[in-house]
Curated annotation (Swiss-Prot):
PROSITE patterns: UROCANASE. NAD(+) binds at residues 45-46, 123, 169-171, 189, 194, 235-236, 256-260, 266-267, 315, 485. It comes from Staphylococcus aureus (strain Mu50 / ATCC 700699). Its main location: cytoplasm. Its cofactor is NAD(+). The gene is hutU. Its EC number is 4.2.1.49. One of its GO terms (biological process) is L-histidine catabolic process to glutamate and formate. It catalyses: 4-imidazolone-5-propanoate = trans-urocanate + H2O. This is Urocanate hydratase.
Amino acid sequence: MRKIQAKKGLSIECKGWEQEAVLRMLYNNLDPEVAERPEDLVVYGGIGKAARNWEAFEAIEKTLRELESDETMLVQSGKPVAVFKTHEEAPRVLISNSVLVPEWANWDHFNELDKKGLIMYGQMTAGSWIYIGSQGIVQGTYETFAELGNQHFNGDLAGTVTLTAGLGGMGGAQPLAITMNHGVAICVDVDETRVDKRIDTKYCDVKTADLDEALKLAEEAKERGEGLSIGLVGNAVDIHQAILEKGFKIDIITDQTSAHDPLNGYVPQGYSVEEAKVLREKDPKKYVELSQASMAKHVELMLEFQKRGAVAFDYGNNIRQVAFNNGVKNAFDFPGFVPAYIRPLFCEGKGQFRFAALSGDPKDIERADEEMRKLFPENEKLLRWLDLAEEKISYQGLPSRIAWLGYGERAKMGLALNRLVRDGEISAPIVIGRDHLDAGSVASPNRETESMKDGSDAVGDWAVLNALINTAAGGSWISFHHGGGVGMGYSLHAGMVVVADGSERAERRLERVLTTDPGMGVARHVDAGYDIAIQTAKEKGIHIPMIDKAGDK
């Protein structure tokens, strides 16, 4: 086992900045500031890994250092399997993680292959080497809670208490996103080290293991109308039950535990983290049974909060499905966050635009933020987000920024970053990518594609087409994964990264990729009949052959 740290500076060890960018982002994924369990190559999300094992990691490293600028490395579930001569505008790396034939696409078969060293779970950005820590999900979480506030609480979360659980790589964004919307958050996690990490990075304000203290702090902050986030150490089922018994009013209930993986991601009721680890190794079958039973209780308690007046929503971890499979027949009585709050953004091709400064110099991000403000002065949501991000976001690993941008905006910003690198206003190349959670890159019936207007929730073609078009457009590294976010059998999704190194070649590739990628989001929603998407496609001149057959009749 090695200790990996994000590499910074202007000298490179690969044969070009593009290959260097891949290597640096791989290292960044495993920097102790970023990864949850770097010693096990685990980045986030249960067992979301950056490489299959240390031997494969070192082979990836070596291959990247030797890779020519007209070659492409193929990575199969975290292991480099081939290098082929392609051309300079082709991707340097193509990645496929944990993709199983549908009949075998379940955790039992995956775990069997995993034990044999034949596969790896890549989550979304763990195995595609573009994770930037909790900031990567903060703006999406912020936008979700902002929209919830608009719909249910007169535009703001001031004077409300949100109860949630899970403070891992994804869930760790919740406390900050809620306080950014002026709400109070009680965030439960059984693993104290996760609470500590969120306190250290200033995503969470205070820590306690005492429920009464947490409720007192929450009530006081609520009465003052101030934002406050409380990391409460404990088991979610126990805590939720106790809060219901005390009759404490919860305004919003959700969950971001790693319920997508009942073996490695969720700790059953009645077990400490250490006890769970022992049982997991000794009797995995029993562990999964206990874990799923706890999840069923967990959802029943969420439904009870909903019955008592709380706004309830699923935050994309598949906990409703597990509960439904274990006898909770009304598990889907509360909606997922995408149909409830995010889909209108997807219809316009709006979604994640994240970038990292390969130099390691925070000044490069400051200059990029300044440029974003100049380019989009009319985008009030974006400007408000940048103000909050600059004030409250701590960098993990390489300095980075996340911003939600739409069709046309992404290409405009990408080209601007390339120009700033070319002119020396930014000191080294910038990596531009996104989460796989985006407008046109995912098929996930319990999350991103839940309740599609035309019933096409489970159609996986769109995620495949996204990977194909971004490869054709010349992304720097392109990935296709299975099971991210919601677990085996429940999702297919694609990722893209493109490097702005200041060159004319990069300019061509950036313009293509940052147009095709959000364009897929618009096309996917046009095909499903969403009028906002149809209007966007017509306004932006996106060529969709059968557009006149789409939409409401």
